């Protein structure tokens, strides 16, 4: 840091900001004192740092972020790792990917970028029911010059072109899976994020399970012969997810634990 940046960091820290966060804000808004003051107020009011900065790293990508989309979680980086591992088993040179509920584009765009770095000519279909989320995902695709993307406004699979049936090598999803009851008990900072990206109705006696169940049920008709579904679910939804897979006729199903030891990522092949 140069010039008066250390002084500014100390001032922000003295006002109540975490010193590391103060350093990030100074680096981001150093050339605009008015914006720096506004950012300080936003963060002190409880707004997530990622929204205040307007961008945040996710794997190899620096993603633009704001209140239109959910802030990507570390668990979703694990989801990408699992998806890459499973996709490698298919030996597809030009894999076709579907990101169901793409949000900021974090998962699908990361897959597209990393597969490209491995020399694979992947194509991505990214769908979301939120026009705002799709707009931001498009912005992130342009930012990182990821052009092999088709964006679709759709409530899960409902508006997906029928020509895609039986073609996807990978369907990846991080749907809402928090129940109404659990949402009221979460950190208040989550009130800044789009509620519909977090909360789902109950299903089959399981809180917040409706969207997970629907994706498990409908995904097989869109997967290719060697295709795989990789889906993140709630830590307490593992048994229900496995049961839903059995009901939907999947032949190869695993539920992987996250870093905290909770069942978190479902891997299923029809």
Predicted regions located by residue number:
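Mobile active-site "lid"/loop adjacent to the S-adenosyl-L-methionine
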Residues: 176-211
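Conserved Class I SAM-dependent methyltransferase catalytic core
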Residues: 206-268
């Amino acid at each position: 840091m140069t010039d008066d940046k250390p002084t500014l960091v100390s001032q922000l820290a003295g006002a109540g900001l975490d010193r590391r966060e103060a350093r990030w804000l100074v680096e981001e808004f150093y050339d605009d004192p008015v914006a720096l003051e506004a950012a300080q107020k936003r963060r002190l009011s409880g707004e997530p740092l990622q929204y205040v900065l307007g961008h945040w790293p996710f794997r190899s990508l620096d993603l633009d972020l704001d209140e239109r989309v959910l802030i990507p979680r570390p668990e979703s980086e694990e989801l990408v790792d699992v998806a890459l591992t499973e996709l490698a088993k298919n030996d597809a040179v030009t894999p076709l990917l579907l990101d169901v509920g793409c949000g900021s584009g974090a998962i699908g765009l990361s897959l597209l970028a990393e597969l490209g770095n491995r020399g694979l000519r992947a194509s991505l279909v990214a769908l979301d029911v939120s026009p705002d989320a799709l707009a931001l995902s498009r912005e992130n695709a342009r930012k990182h010059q990821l052009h092999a993307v088709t964006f679709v406004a759709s409530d899960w699979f409902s508006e997906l072109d029928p020509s895609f049936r039986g073609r996807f090598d990978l369907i990846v999803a991080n749907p809402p899976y928090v129940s109404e009851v659990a949402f009221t008990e979460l950190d208040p900072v989550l009130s800044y994020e789009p509620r519909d990206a977090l909360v789902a109705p109950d299903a089959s006696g399981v809180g917040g399970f409706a969207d997970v169940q629907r994706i498990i049920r409908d995904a097989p008709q869109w997967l290719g012969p060697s295709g795989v579904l990789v889906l993140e679910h709630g830590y307490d939804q593992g048994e229900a997810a496995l049961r839903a897979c059995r009901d939907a006729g999947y032949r190869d199903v695993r539920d992987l634990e996250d870093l905290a030891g909770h069942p978190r990522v479902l891997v299923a092949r029809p």
